[in-house]
């Protein structure tokens, strides 16, 4: 997790702006530690989003994602997943990650990507993620993700 916190009370948090400084710095720090992505918490300690992605969790086939009010940018792929699946928006704290079997991130360039580890928690299961990826590939006609 990033040590930088998202400001859930700032209106700029919810819009794409040209200020990617925090995301760039945190993504570089993560890469230096051998990580692909970093996840931000807000001032209340709730999980928000990745530096370049939205984050989802799966428990017993049910999909969960942080609420917009946690301080995240509502990405295009997040919207796609929310539209095609029954997704519950809720507050998610790092200490509750053990209740989930799967985790994935989304963005328009990488699509739907599984997360193997977030902090101390490992996510080995991929059933729901594979179904989502296949559905997305079908919609895209294999153009984006052969």
Can you annotate each of these PLM segments?
Residues 1-146:
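Helix-start/capping segments and mature chain N-termini
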